[in-house]
Amino acid sequence: MSTCRESMEGQNQILINRIKGNLRRPSWASVLLLFTVIALISLLQINREYSISLLIPLDFGLISGSRPGPQISSSCSDFFKQVPARKVVKSIRDFGGIGDGKTSNTKAFRRAMEFMARFTDSGGSQLVVPKGRWLTGSFNLSSNFTLFLEQGAVILGSQDLKEWPLINALPSYGRGRERLGARHISLIHGNGLTNVVITGENGTVDGQGKMWWELWWNRTLVHTRGHLVELINSQNILIHNLTFLNSPFWTIHPVYCRNIVIRNMTILAPWNAPNTDGIDPADSSVNVCVEDCYIESGDDLVAVKSGWDQYGMKMARPSSNIIVRRVTGTTPTCSGVGIGSEMSGGVSNVIIEDLYVRDSAAGVRIKTDRGRGGYITNITINNMKMERVKVPIRFSRGANDHPDERWDPKAVPRVRGIRISNVVSLESKRPPLLEGIEEAPFLDIHMENVSIFGLAPNMKWNCEYISGSSCSIFPAPCSQLKNESTFQCPIH
């Protein structure tokens, strides 16, 4: 859990209007053109008595059509080409639901799910939520099931704590993430499921999380907050074409899952809302695709995890085979994409590409420390654009929160095989920070075609206990990243 914080209230309606109204998020082509023009203007302002080729790499990976690094298809969601048809389709109204925003529909949703579970092995089922405001506590999904929100449908999270029952802590965490013991269930929940779709016509799920945030701020929270959506020990999951607002805690949290697709999502929370990660797509999960999402939150936009200290190491369920692409967003206190800090089961084979992060604390961050154990390996980050990001690239220690006193300070993480290429950061505040661990240096870190603009001339990269190589970097990287000739760049 991050300690990211920033006080800024009343953001949601502004954000919703901006996303859903006439103002459109910029196309990738326009963003590409903007970065190219600004980069060229910056070049023209450089003192002409120096050779431009010595000062800054000319090939950003933005101008040409080819991309260094792994060549993968334009979509990683091929196994969900079409939402499956269901034999039984019912409306929440069929179970007594009233969409007036005031009447509790908790019993209606739970009755609906009990009914839908009958068709798990006989053609599946779909629950339609029509236009309206549907107040409800938590409810459990079933297998071979689709939750479909029509245009104008809004599911509202109950403000009654009793309608978010307590469930056991995850075994890879050993306790609730925020408090000892049990934790609150998520608003939309499932365990041991197969073939689950949560989709619609850009309907909305609003967790109404302010009640939960105030418990955290006031230090009166007794049990760990629930997520907006959590699926456990499940497979073949599609979350698609919806808006998620105001999660009490992490917004989307698949754990111990496989074959997960999260696409075309808008996820919003106030920038000061604590620990409202947008998507934690892989917590000890494998085969994950996240693409084409817009996120603004009070924590990481996307965070990859795999368990906490000795509990994660004991369970030893890694997160692997993960693709995150075409994610845009803002998090003034955290990172666009974070790996860790809970990564004790291991993280490997991650591709992150085509990210646009603005007005944020960090672009990409690897977070770990003594006690975590585990490993982070074979991470590829390619084609990333940033504006007004404080620290564009950050590998940092300082994950000094532990589940209990039994954590092992000798359990150090192993980090190696990190490839970062084709990165442009404008109006940066600080240079990259790369901090390994003395007894376990971060190895085989390679950076190519990385340009960080906006830094004062006296600002230098900060590196400690790392080793690797670099090619075409501006400004010059730290000496631990051995400089290679442009003609020997291994990614080319």
Where are these regions (language model features)?
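Extracellular/periplasmic carbohydrate-active domains that bind, remodel
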Residues: 2-492
